[in-house]
């Protein structure tokens, strides 16, 4: 297998934006990474099995806790990119953390090959070989490439269905270029590309590259448990056949006609994984209204004169989502610039007028003369149809006219729109415009004579909601597109959910119940039919613009009431790690129904009971996580060609054996597998299953991940249902969408080559943790290289020079540092446990190093303590092992001289003692002091320039006096009590009216600034700070003692000759100034008067005075 390896220079030209100037440090780190990757491979560091002790599983797990993490196996039609790595990192970080907690961690990965993408690409290559030969010698005139963007409209416009927005990173673009050029962009030499015309060659080429890239990335994967999907692997093939047989036998898989997105070119349904664009788009069901043409205008008669329309019923077909509004039709709209066709329908002597696109859909929905055949008799411009007289089914106005509408789309619906201006803001705005400018549009006013008819009564918008909303939103014309879109959504929701019919036989009924009845009536009377088309544009992997077809097919009956109920139960028990993901599941369960589970083209497993079909790729990938637990015992290679440790042959894995292993059925009577082997299979499954976390992109919630829940509930006992599913957002790069065409793109292999594995991992950890778009910053990855290199050198230097460090009892700064280490251990543990890796990285890397730097600075005059330096290094190594395992392993073994790998003997660090709040508060106080002192100096100089305050020259030797207080002014206590009385903790709000009315008017000037400041301190307090702790006004430490301890540091840091501390003893009153005692300074013990501007000092908020002193 050969790949074209770019040089470092080529890599930096090809990928993203950042060019590395000096790579010595990076190269050193990469050299270490290669060393330890080889070591882990030789030591089989990540290979893990269930314990062999013969005790019940629950006892076994208690004695040997386990953790099983995984992600959807990547598709093998290319190299992994940073988006894959981002999701992989979520599993990697979680499992690495659990390994440090002493658990037996299983992290496997398979290779997905099922479906049509590989076959479609192979077929394209075959055609290109026919065109250009195996060397792909393209004539110069054909070399030009054209880039087009495929835009997918918002998925579902019907508000009765779930809809989701695509993020910035999710928008897909399709490049019109040759497949062999795509292969070259993947690093495949042109001389080898012809081999990929054989679909199965892909299966041998990309899996090894995937494993290489993951290994270079430092992932802790048990590669023994890898496999490829499809019938190429007979063991996995047997597993999938067992799975679908169970679903079929239990009635979960059914056969029948259903509407599905379909590729005419491929001749089969086009499921999510078969699409180049339009993932998540499904069929949109309309009611096709037959508006029989009663009289054509002169222009239309001329255009159609070559077509024999005698004895023919010609119907303009209007597709509507709101059949209940047909009572109020006043006219019909066409796009004047759209070309319409006249097509033979499935009814003899009946012709349809609609767009060609709609006719393509109808031809595969039993609405044409012959399935799959569009019988077009002729075409006509929309302009020529204006003025036609048509029948309006159910309408109060039986016969209406055709009018122009510029906003009618040829790519949506049928191109014909029936107008109901009472309830459609678009229709109302257009009709109003046409009436105003009838002469301009060359329209006969007679064509617009019908007034809007009240159809639906709504509580918010009355009986004519379209007119109401157009006035409310100040819509002046059809060109107010934004406001009309808003009005349309508001009208639809209000009418459907709150509206009541006020006309017709269903008058008095809620719209929700009347809508299907009106629709049925129209269809039963032959006035309408069911019509489907894709909700948005769907482009297949083969480049086909897909339609919706009515197909006889095997489908999974997702949404069936009892199955849905038990799946909802599984969701209730599932840890989704965020409310957005749970809501995504709930919405999917609301709309998800029948899903085609078979196809006729592609790679995969044959349906056991109907082998002409293959199991589709979102069906064979729902419970394979269970297969991970035992596959290393079945086969020793990913293709299943070599039997595994138990020497079991594929044909021995009968349905009864699978049942015994996965469903605890009785031991098969006729199996040739030994009892010991069966017991081993059962033990591996029962010990590791269910999985604890499955990380995935959020785009899989509406399909794969929900299917995963459904299938688990159908096949497994409750105790084996999934425990956790974590979804992440898409990954941007340098703040922009990843795109090969712009160069803002990077494969995983390129990233580890450019930055090294550990630096790449750190940048991915920092990228983000929510379901929103995350961002990989190259600059951060680059800075991580320097940080790791520098820290390694510092750790080595310290451990080699321990004798130069201080020993003996801990002083104040030692205790504060030790406490901060403990605090960061706890915050890191909390973040890791919640899979909040950006927060974990901040605590265990940035904050921990800042803590060390601070400690080094405050102890500069007395040196750091030897024991604490050693503890910090070991803590840093263990905490960072999750993110930077190679770096940590190196220091663990070579600097700390540990005898075993960190993956074997390393454990998440424990606190040396509970976190001391007083020490934490002291540290926060100290770190704030330097900043506040500098601000005070600047403020004093500013006042001095205005002629206020004591003269002071900052360039000369200076003394700083710090004024502190032990008690709050007595007058403030009553207002603190008042604020506490009128504080609502659940809403984090104060009753301002009650507070103001309780304050004496004479006290307003003094009280209100204090009240406002105190309110803000309560409202804006930290997440882990209670309101009571603010109201208590307790510092939690002795301010005077802390100041004494940090005095040497402040003298150095602030650059002063002397630090003087004055304690406020007696507050000022009307007859005398405030009095203070000098606690520290050249005049210690003296009693001094305190100037008024310093007399308002309160505990925790000292005030400062700078003075010049003689050198």
UniProtKB/Swiss-Prot annotation:
PROSITE patterns: AA_TRNA_LIGASE_I
Listed InterPro entries: aa-tRNA-synth_Ia (IPR002300), Leu-tRNA-synth_Ia_arc/euk (IPR004493), M/V/L/I-tRNA-synth_anticd-bd (IPR013155), RBD_LARS1 (IPR055416), Rossmann-like_a/b/a_fold (IPR014729), tRNAsynth_Ia_anticodon-bd (IPR009080), Val/Leu/Ile-tRNA-synth_edit (IPR009008)
Superkingdom, natural source: Eukaryota
Keyword Endoplasmic reticulum found: no
Keywords: Aminoacyl-tRNA synthetase, ATP-binding, Cytoplasm, Ligase, Nucleotide-binding, Phosphoprotein, Protein biosynthesis
GO biological-process terms attached to the record: cytoplasmic translation; leucyl-tRNA aminoacylation
Modified residues (Phosphoserine): 460
Signal peptide: none
The reaction(s) this protein catalyses: tRNA(Leu) + L-leucine + ATP = L-leucyl-tRNA(Leu) + AMP + diphosphate
Annotated Pfam families: Anticodon_1, RBD_LARS1, tRNA-synt_1
Motif position, 'HIGH' region: 74-84
Locations listed in the record: Cytoplasm
Cellular component, GO annotation: cytosol
Motif ('KMSKS' region): 737-741
Parts forming coiled coils: none
SUPFAM superfamilies in alphabetical order: Anticodon-binding domain of a subclass of class I aminoacyl-tRNA synthetases, Nucleotidylyl transferase, ValRS/IleRS/LeuRS editing domain
Binding site for ATP: 740
Family affiliation: Belongs to the class-I aminoacyl-tRNA synthetase family.
PANTHER family: LEUCINE--TRNA LIGASE, CYTOPLASMIC, LEUCYL-TRNA SYNTHETASE
Protein name: Putative leucine--tRNA ligase, cytoplasmic
Biological source species: Schizosaccharomyces pombe (strain 972 / ATCC 24843)
């Amino acid at each position: 297998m050969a790949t074209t390896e770019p040089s470092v220079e080529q890599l930096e030209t090809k990928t993203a934006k950042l060019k590395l100037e000096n790579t010595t440090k990076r190269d050193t780190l990469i050299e270490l990474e290669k060393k330890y990757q080889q070591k882990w491979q030789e030591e089989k560091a990540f290979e893990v099995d269930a314990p062999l002790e013969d005790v019940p599983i629950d006892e076994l797990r208690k004695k040997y806790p386990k953790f099983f993490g995984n992600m959807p196996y990547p598709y093998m039609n290319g190299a992994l990119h940073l988006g894959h790595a981002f999701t992989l990192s979520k599993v990697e970080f979680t499992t690495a953390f659990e390994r440090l907690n002493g658990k037996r961690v299983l992290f496997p990965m398979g290779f997905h090959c099922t479906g049509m993408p590989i076959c479609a690409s192979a077929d394209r290559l075959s055609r290109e070989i026919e065109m250009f030969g195996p060397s792909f010698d393209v004539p110069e005139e054909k070399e030009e490439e054209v880039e087009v963007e495929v835009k997918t409209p918002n998925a579902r416009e019907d508000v009765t269905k779930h809809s989701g927005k695509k993020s910035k990173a999710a928008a897909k673009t399709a490049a019109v270029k040759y497949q062999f050029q795509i292969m070259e962009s993947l690093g495949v030499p042109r001389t080898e590309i012809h081999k990929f015309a054989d679909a199965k060659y892909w299966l041998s080429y990309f899996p090894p590259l995937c494993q290489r890239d993951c290994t270079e990335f430092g992932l802790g994967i048990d590669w023994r448990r890898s496999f490829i999907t499809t019938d190429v692997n007979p063991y996995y093939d047997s597993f999938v056949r067992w799975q679908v047989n169970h679903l079929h036998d239990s009635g979960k898989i059914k056969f029948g006609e259903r509407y599905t997105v379909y590729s005419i070119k491929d001749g089969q349904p086009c499921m999510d994984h078969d699409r180049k664009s339009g993932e998540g788009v499904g069929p949109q069901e309309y009611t096709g209204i037959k508006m029989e043409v009663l009289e054509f205008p002169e222009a239309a008669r001329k255009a159609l004169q070559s077509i024999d329309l005698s004895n023919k019923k010609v119907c303009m077909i209007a597709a509507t989502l709101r059949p209940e509004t047909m009572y109020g039709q006043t006219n019909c709209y066409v796009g004047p610039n759209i070309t319409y066709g006249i097509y033979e329908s499935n009814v003899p002597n009946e012709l349809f007028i609609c767009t060609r696109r709609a006719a393509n859909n109808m031809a595969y929905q039993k609405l044409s003369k012959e399935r799959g055949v569009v019988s077009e008799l002729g075409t006509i411009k929309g302009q020529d149809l204006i003025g036609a007289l048509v029948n309006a089914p159910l309408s109060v106005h039986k016969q209406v006219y055709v009018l122009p509408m510029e906003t009618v789309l040829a790519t949506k619906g049928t191109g014909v729109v029936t107008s109901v201006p009472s309830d459609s803001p678009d229709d109302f705005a257009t009709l109003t415009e046409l009436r105003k400018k009838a002469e301009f549009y060359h329209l006969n006013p007679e064509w617009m004579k019908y007034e809007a008819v009240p159809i639906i009564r709504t509580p918010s918008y009355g009986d004519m909601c379209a007119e109401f909303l157009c006035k409310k939103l100040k819509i002046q014309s059809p060109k107010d597109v934004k406001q009309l879109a808003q009005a349309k959504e508001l009208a639809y929701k209000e009418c459907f959910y709150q509206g009541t019919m006020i006309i017709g036989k269903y008058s008095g009924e809620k719209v929700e119940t009347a809508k299907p009845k009106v629709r049925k009536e129209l269809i039963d009377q032959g006035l309408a039919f069911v019509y489907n088309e894709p909700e948005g544009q769907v482009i297949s992997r083969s480049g086909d613009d897909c339609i919706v077809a009515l197909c006889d097919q095997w489908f999974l009956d997702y949404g069936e009431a009892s199955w849905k109920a038990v799946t909802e139960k599984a969701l209730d028990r599932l840890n989704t790690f965020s409310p957005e993901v749970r809501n995504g599941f709930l919405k999917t369960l609301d709309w998800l129904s029948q899903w085609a589970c078979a196809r006729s083209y592609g790679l995969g497993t044959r349906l056991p009971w109907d082998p002409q079909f293959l199991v589709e790729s979102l069906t064979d990938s729902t419970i394979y996580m269970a297969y991970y637990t035992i596959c290393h015992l079945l086969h020793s290679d990913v293709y299943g060609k070599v039997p595994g440790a138990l020497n079991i042959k594929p044909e021995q894995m009968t349905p009864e054996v699978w049942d015994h292993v996965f469903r605890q059925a009785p031991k098969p009577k006729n199996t040739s597998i030994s009892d010991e082997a069966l017991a081993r299979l059962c033990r591996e499954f029962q010990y590791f299953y269910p999985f604890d976390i499955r990380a995935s992109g959020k785009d899989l919630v509406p399909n794969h991940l929900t299917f995963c829940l459904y299938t688990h509930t159908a096949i497994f006992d409750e105790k084996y249902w999934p425990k956790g599913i974590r979804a992440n957002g898409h990954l941007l790069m340098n703040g922009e969408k990843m795109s090969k065409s712009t160069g803002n793109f990077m494969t995983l292999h390129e990233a580890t080559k450019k930055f090294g594995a550990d630096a790449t991992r750190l940048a991915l950890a920092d990228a983000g943790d929510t379901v929103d778009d995350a961002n990989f910053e190259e600059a951060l990855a680059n800075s991580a290289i320097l940080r790791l290199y520098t820290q390694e050198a510092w750790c080595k230097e310290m451990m080699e020079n321990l004798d130069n460090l201080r020993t003996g009892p801990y002083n104040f700064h030692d205790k504060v540092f030790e406490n901060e280490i403990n605090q960061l251990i706890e915050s890191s543990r909390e973040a890791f446990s919640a899979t909040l890796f950006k927060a974990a990285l901040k605590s265990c890397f940035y904050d921990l190093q800042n803590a060390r730097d601070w400690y080094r600075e405050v102890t500069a005059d007395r040196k750091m303590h030897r024991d604490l330096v050693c503890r910090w290094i070991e803590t840093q190594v263990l905490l960072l092992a999750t993110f930077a395992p190679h770096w940590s392993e190196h220091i663990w073994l070579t600097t700390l001289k540990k005898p075993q790998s960190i993956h074997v003997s390393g454990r998440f660090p424990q606190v040396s003692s509970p976190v001391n709040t007083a020490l934490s508060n002291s540290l926060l106080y100290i770190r704030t002091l330097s900043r506040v002192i500098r601000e005070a100096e600047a403020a004093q100089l500013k006042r001095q320039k205005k002629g206020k305050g004591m003269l002071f020259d900052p360039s000369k030797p200076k003394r700083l006096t710090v004024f502190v207080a032990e008690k709050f002014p007595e007058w403030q206590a009553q207002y603190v009590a008042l604020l506490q009385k009128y504080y609502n903790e659940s809403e984090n709000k104060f009753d301002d009216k009650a507070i103001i009315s309780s304050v004496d008017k004479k006290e307003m000037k003094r009280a209100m600034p204090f009240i406002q400041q105190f309110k803000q301190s309560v409202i804006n307090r930290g997440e882990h700070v209670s309101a009571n702790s603010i109201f208590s006004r307790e510092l939690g430490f002795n301010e005077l003692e802390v100041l004494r301890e940090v005095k040497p540091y402040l003298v150095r840091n602030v650059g002063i000759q002397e630090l003087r501390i004055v304690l406020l003893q007696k507050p000022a009153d009307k007859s005398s100034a405030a009095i203070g005692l000098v606690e520290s300074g050249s005049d210690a013990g003296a009693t001094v008067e305190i100037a008024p501007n310093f007399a308002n000092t309160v505990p925790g908020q000292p005030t400062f005075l700078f003075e010049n002193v003689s050198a």
